[in-house]
């Protein structure tokens, strides 16, 4: 069974590629951009998800960041480790299970001076159920996942789960027990084909999948909404 699973993962990666090691979206000119072009520094200074300007950018191996201002770019260059999102910008909830999948720049949180991004509101809510344990698990697993393409790593760890893995049903039960008066968000995550094979991380936010507001990809998509130096809106729980 294990051999069959590895064969499937290898075949999938041969057909679609193993994915990038960071949660990037590729521009038509080939640039791999983080956070759909949102400014990583603005999360700290403005406490908002704000789009950067493609003309004000800096590149690190495998990823490029846009900034609202030259001042923010210089802040980043002085200490990139202080501003880069944890776990390659992938969903911090999935990272707790050594999975690199999903990235929504409008779902974020800063804890102890570190920026955590989530794939969607469901990942964010799941992570909050046991924030410290999820951070600890993700940090312990990151050496395994850091340099691996997201598709390969996610398919591997969905097939061969870490001992502390939780299913969606497990998480919903925990949520109901902790918040008996709250409803689990009604959010469409898309299909497995879309999330694992046909789309890049961040696609749901970019396209406005289901009830998700269209965030767009600054420098690539129409303005509005994807205008430089503007804020972007997250999915709103009704």
Residue ranges of predicted features:
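Sec-dependent signal peptide recognition
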Residues: 2-9
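Generic detector of N-terminal low-structure segments
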Residues: 9-10, 237
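Intrinsically disordered, low-complexity terminal tails and linkers in eukaryotic proteins, enriched
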Residues: 18-61, 82-238
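Short, well-structured hydrophobic secondary-structure segments
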Residues: 61-69
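Beta-edge loop/turn motif
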Residues: 69-72, 120
């Amino acid at each position: 069974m294990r051999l069959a699973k590895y064969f499937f993962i290898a075949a999938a990666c041969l057909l679609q590629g193993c994915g990038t090691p960071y949660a990037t979206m590729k521009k038509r000119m080939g640039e791999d951009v983080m956070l759909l072009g949102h400014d990583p520094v603005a999360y700290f200074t403005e406490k908002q998800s704000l789009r950067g300007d493609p003309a004000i950018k800096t590149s690190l191996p495998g990823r490029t960041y846009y900034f609202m201002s030259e001042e923010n770019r210089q802040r980043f260059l002085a200490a990139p480790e202080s501003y880069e999102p944890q776990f390659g910008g992938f969903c911090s909830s999935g990272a707790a299970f050594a999975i690199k999948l999903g990235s929504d720049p409008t779902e974020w949180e800063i804890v102890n001076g570190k920026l955590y991004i989530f794939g969607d509101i469901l990942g964010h809510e799941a992570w909050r159920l046991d924030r410290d344990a999820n951070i600890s698990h993700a940090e312990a697993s990151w050496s395994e996942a850091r340099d691996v393409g997201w598709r390969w790593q996610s398919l591997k760890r969905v097939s061969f789960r870490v001992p502390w893995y939780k299913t969606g049903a497990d998480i919903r039960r925990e949520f109901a027990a902790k918040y008996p008066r709250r409803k689990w968000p009604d959010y469409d995550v898309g299909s497995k084909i879309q999330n694992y094979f046909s789309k890049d991380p961040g696609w749901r936010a970019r396209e406005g999948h289901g009830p998700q507001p269209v965030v767009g990809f600054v420098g690539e998509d129409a303005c509005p909404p994807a205008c430089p130096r503007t804020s972007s809106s997250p999915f709103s729980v009704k």
